[in-house]
Amino acid sequence: MVAKAMANESRANAEQQAMINRLANEFADELNNLGVRVSNLENKVGNVKVTGDARLRYQGSDKKGEISSDNTNKKSLFDMRGRVQFNANVNDNTSAVIRVTSGDMEFGDSTTSDVEFDRVYVAHKFGKDTTAVAGRFGAFVGNGLVYDDTFDGAAVNYDNGNFSATAAYGSFMEGGLFNNGSMSSYAHDFSDATSDENATVTLLQAKAKLGEHATVGGFYTFGNKNLDNDIYGGSLDLNYGKVWLGGEYATFSDKDGTLVQSNDKDAWVAGIGYGDYDIAKEGTWGVKVQYFDEGKYSPVISSTFNQPYNSDYKAWMASVDYALAKNVGLSGYWAFNAEDQSGNDLGDYYRAELNYKF
């Protein structure tokens, strides 16, 4: 009956076609067994894949005002975030992606909801190893110490499994640079800038596997319009089964010489971890301990790590991840023995979150 309906689908109205598509999808195996051609069934039922995630997060600090810049008396914060992503196949080599996010919404605060599109881009594959993207996408600089967030522009990436290289041009869209004390006159806020105000950068980076256990990487970010600083760095990762050791270093050069007098302009992180955490695999877990040292004029903008400060910060951080169920993960972080570069105590920082993938 379904096969006959598919054969006469052109005569059906829109409602009937939708019903035929649903039935064809439901009985795909049976139709195949009967010899009915359903190889293009995915084109009938749509070529858009919907994925997403939801997060419930708690943050706390020993000191007031470090969790929320809007409330200097607050020592803890409980918020939530939801994101939905649409991946559409335009053809065999081209795809379009749109992601909607709620932003971080604090529980009980009716003013923090801010739904927006944080991913809108197209991607085209050239052969097996090369992909070009353009639009608003996610950029991962180096190992993520300096930047892991939204990027507006275009990029070309090559990755054969053992060696990868990326060239990109555009603007960072989140975080801030040099927004610290005496450097405020040189600061740049990427998250609150018009297209005329925002800086543009050219990013070149590469990463290679050295044997079975080591991976080394490096990047160089050229400051273009509205940014007179080049940011660069390198990383090393060692993996031995479930054991990981790694670190990353980043600094900047000042092209016009105004900041040369500063010697405290670098940032680095090093750590060790154990485990095989995968949120898609129930019961997997991982633990990690890292040490962060970020100078007063650190080039960190929006880091992949969950340290509470981008600059003038030194601390240890312990973290643990556990997959409670398939696609449900619990993570906890504790930053301790924290101080600024002058030795002043900054207090401990705590973070716990539940993540859901779908």
Regions inferred by a protein language model and the residue ranges of each:
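Outer membrane beta-barrel
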Residues: 46-49, 53-56, 73-182, 198-215, ...
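N-terminal periplasmic/intermembrane-space "pro-region" immediately following the signal or transit peptide
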Residues: 1-55
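Intrinsically disordered, low-complexity Ser/Thr- and acidic-rich flexible linkers and loops
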Residues: 178-194
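Short, low-complexity, polar/charged sequence segments that are solvent-exposed and flexible
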Residues: 151-155, 186, 306-310
